[in-house]
Amino acid sequence: MPLNREDKQAVVAEVAAQVAKAQTVVLAEYRGIAVGDLTTLRAKAREQKVYLRVLKNTLARRAVEGTPFAPLAEQMTGPLIYGISEDAIAAAKVVNDFSKSNDKLVIKAGSYDGKVMDKAGVQALASIPSREELLSKLLFVMQAPVSGFARALAALAEKKQAEAA
């Protein structure tokens, strides 16, 4: 069923609101993908707080107009699913991980920090560890010298007790 003018304006406003707070937009071609697979992708996207939607390209172009994602409009051709996220890597990671297991989902382009990326750029962005992973690695690196020092002190205390006995 075709959308009337008010419905189209509502869709553009909704997507424009998502794009306004987004850091990353990823476009992927979904030609021939099964409904069950698309449902799985949407569930994974929801878990990662990624706005995932199939849109008419004309409406998507209107939504990104005047934003840092405007140069991405040139890539908006064919049947596309749009992944939009506030997290810098979440949309790229969700779409890239799913495209590895489903060859019908093909990453077409993406945009981050006002720059348009090709498929390789989106895959590179997806390979970056998440913020939580980076923080845990940093904590481990900071904690290692302290725990080593504590073990050395414990060994020294044991040695002193052994000498005293």
Curated annotation (Swiss-Prot):
One of its GO terms (biological process) is translation. InterPro entries: Ribosomal_uL10 (IPR001790), Ribosomal_uL10-like_sf (IPR043141), Ribosomal_uL10_bac (IPR022973), Ribosomal_uL10_bac_type (IPR047865). GO terms for cellular component: ribonucleoprotein complex; ribosome. It holds the Pfam family Ribosomal_L10. GO terms for molecular function: large ribosomal subunit rRNA binding. Transmembrane segments: none annotated. Keywords: Ribonucleoprotein, Ribosomal protein, RNA-binding, rRNA-binding. Forms part of the ribosomal stalk, playing a central role in the interaction of the ribosome with GTP-bound translation factors. Part of the ribosomal stalk of the 50S ribosomal subunit. The N-terminus interacts with L11 and the large rRNA to form the base of the stalk. The C-terminus forms an elongated spine to which L12 dimers bind in a sequential fashion forming a multimeric L10(L12)X complex. HAMAP family: Ribosomal_uL10 (MF_00362). Belongs to the universal ribosomal protein uL10 family. This is Large ribosomal subunit protein uL10.
